[in-house]
Amino acid sequence: MTGSWLQRQAQLHPERPAFYWHEKSWSFAALQKEVYAYAAYYQAQFVDQPNRVALFSNNSPEMVFTILALWELGIEVQLLNTRLTAAEISFQLQDAHCDWVITADQTAVSDVRSLTFGQAIKQAEAFVGSVVPSFVPNEAIYQAEQVASIMYTSGTTGNPKGVPQTFGNHLASAEATQKNLAITSEDCWLCAVPLYHISGLSILLRSLRLGMSVRLYERFDAGEMAKDLEAGKGTIVSLVAKMLTDLLPLVPQQGFDSLRYILLGGGPIAKSVLEKCQQKLLSVIQSYGMTETCSQVVALPPEKASEKIGASGVTLQGVHLRIATDGKMADHQTAENTQPIGEIQLQGPAITTRYLNDRSPQQWDQEGWFATGDLGYLDQEGFLYVVSRASELIISGGENIYPAEVEQALLQHPAVKEAAVVGEPDEEWGQSVAAYLTLNQPIHFQALLDTLEGQIAHYKFPRRFYHVREMPRTASGKVLKRLLLSEERVNYIEQQINK
């Protein structure tokens, strides 16, 4: 059957529930009707159909309809994180050569237009009670090699890189998740993570491919989600550490009857939280993935969830993983682990093969192995344990924060001589941002926050600032950030600036 995955579901299962938003619901047939109306509307707006369109929107039915409509038109969708600053958005639009921007916020249209050389239009509203524009479905879409979505992720130097994700990548990811979690059309996946993140978009794509339903939320609200789970409105939910810690106090002692799995991503979580989940009969599936891998490529098998607390899991269907150990990795051995620690490298159909504009081509070797930059090890049973993420990447509340971005922003203040940004363990957020500074002169922490304003998004702001006499360094002069997170840090901290 040719055409889109939505067309396929609407033909085979027209009355099957596809999508929920509060008290509203759409079958696959109703969803297709709405999407076709949106496709016709956008088609009429474009003088010449673009190859790529950016979308600036938060979770909503209109965002879902817009994404699917653009795919029906054969257009690549660049998803913009709405929490970024104007400067960050402007860079992404220009780097992706995106001439059209669709925005959900009417007041933001002029602002977004000023950031691009092209045109901005307001996201369409639902065509309820109006004449639905005609649309002729396109058959030559959803091809494996076609780019479906583009998301930006920072590199280890902090420079954002565009990740083109093909329908083939998304297909491999959806089918691997289906096999691991035994997903059926009876499942309903609760999605309170942003659709502009791969964790959110992948849920929508699983629905289209596998025929399950999605209950979408504008944002995460622990009380609302607990109420829906108590009412049996979901069987699987995707959460990050912060969401899980907020939800946990609202979970009954015997858990939720309808909830099969909590898929946990977005970085580290305290083992104490996972143990509390076990006590409440919650099956937490830890996972490992990233934008470049179209969501999870490693996950715990459900039957091992309670036994392997702390592990990210085993590779999913079609994914190959190796630990590249060489001389550079020797100093990462730990007393708790006797297995060799090295860089996690991946290969498989869910993994993108390039960055936009051919950035960082060295991350793929000639055999297609992708070098993640993350450090980890495999235990005797082949379970992956991640030691550190993407060369000191901080993941706080599910958001990726690269230290280099924050460090460069801090160095704009003349009082800051050196800056080293690290992620500190945080039971609520997974990790929180801390900045260690050497100073040219005394400074109040509020002045540091004022310096960051407008340079980087608020979620990247450090929660703690430390003044250090000197940075711990290697013989070659590189800052030893791991010492700033160890007990030895007391030898370096002079004072905590924001206390």
Language model regions located:
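Conserved AMP-binding/adenylate-forming
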Residues: 24, 39-84, 400
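Conserved AMP-binding A3 loop
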Residues: 27-29, 148-172
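AMP-binding/adenylate-forming catalytic core of the ANL superfamily
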Residues: 63, 101, 348, 353-354, ...
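Gly/Ser/Thr-rich phosphate-binding loop
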Residues: 235-239, 248-307, 320, 327
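Conserved ATP/PPi-binding loop(s) of AMP-dependent carboxylate-activating enzymes
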Residues: 314-318, 328-363, 399-401
